[in-house]
């Protein structure tokens, strides 16, 4: 095949994935996916606002916001990520339409399209969350969050959400009962309640703990004076690399397994 022929084939495949993503987004609208995300995000921000309103009485340091938000994320976002992914995959599972779809689409394209759809939805959710949290902090009287630190928070949060979504998509595509992926999301959210209190050598094995592990804010408490001191720490690139590598590995293995799956 000539270079032009290969380029044309690759272009067609990219267009195929793009069309499939557009179809998945339309399916999500019919399933009220955006409404579900908005409701869960609203509860998250209400809880965050309640906690922040109590803390602003002690200090207006913006780092309080950057410390508190990952704690809330560890509880809410694993479940939200699981709900998004399960909803995107649920239509085909309920109607047992995989065989019909794979007569029109390559298995790899279908898998990637569903993953990209989840990634786009989660990116929108995380963007709305970080923007909303910053606005709440400003309204309560906290210092403005620097754009660079807000960006790091956005990248860190999305990376963990995508890891959860990748694992849940694998479960959705290989397990007919969609209750199982949701149980995984609930379990990760439950573990998120305790993730900030686990020793580092334990928390690295808990996916929801990475919301806190990737934080750029440190906190120290002086029991004698009962004073909390906030500090900025270097972004833990090592933890970020771990979550990215594990996500890539899970994606590659799931993609290969789905392409070879007997339907």
Task: Give the residues covered by each predicted segment.
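Helix-loop-helix units of permease transmembrane domains in multi-pass membrane transporters
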Residues: 86-120
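Transmembrane alpha-helical segments in integral membrane proteins
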Residues: 80-92, 169-179, 243-260
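Secretory targeting signals
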Residues: 40-87, 112-178, 191-193, 225-237
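Terminal transmembrane helical anchor/hairpin motif
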Residues: 3, 14, 51, 55-64, ...
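Aromatic- and glycine-rich beta-strand/loop motifs that create alpha-glucan
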Residues: 1-38
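Cytoplasmic juxtamembrane interface segments
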Residues: 10-22, 88-99, 163-191
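Membrane-helix boundary and inter-helical linker elements of multi-pass secondary transporters
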Residues: 30, 103, 173-174
């Amino acid at each position: 095949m000539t270079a032009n022929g290969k380029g044309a084939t690759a272009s067609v495949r990219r267009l195929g994935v793009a069309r499939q993503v557009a179809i998945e987004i339309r399916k999500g609208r019919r399933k009220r996916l955006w409404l579900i995300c908005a409701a869960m995000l609203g509860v998250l921000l209400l809880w965050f606002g309640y906690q922040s309103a109590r803390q602003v009485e002690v200090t207006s340091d913006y780092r309080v916001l950057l410390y508190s938000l990952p704690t809330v994320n560890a509880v809410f976002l694993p479940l939200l990520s699981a709900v998004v992914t399960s909803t995107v995959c649920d239509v085909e599972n309920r109607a047992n339409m995989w065989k019909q779809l794979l007569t029109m689409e390559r298995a790899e394209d279908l898998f990637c399209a569903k993953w990209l759809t989840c990634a786009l939805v989660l990116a929108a959710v995380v963007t709305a969350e970080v923007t909303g949290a910053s606005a709440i902090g400003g309204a309560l009287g906290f210092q403005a969050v620097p754009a660079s630190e807000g960006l790091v928070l956005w990248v860190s949060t999305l990376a963990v959400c995508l890891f959860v979504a990748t694992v849940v998509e694998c479960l959705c595509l290989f397990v007919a009962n969609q209750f199982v992926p949701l149980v995984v999301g609930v379990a990760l959210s439950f573990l998120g309640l305790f993730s900030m209190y686990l020793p580092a050598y334990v928390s690295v094995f808990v996916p929801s703990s990475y919301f806190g592990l990737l934080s750029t804010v440190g906190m120290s408490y002086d029991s004698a004076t009962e004073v909390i001191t906030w500090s900025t720490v270097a972004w833990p690139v090592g933890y970020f690399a771990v979550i990215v590598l594990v996500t890539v590995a899970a994606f590659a293995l799931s993609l290969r397994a789905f392409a070879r799956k007997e339907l």
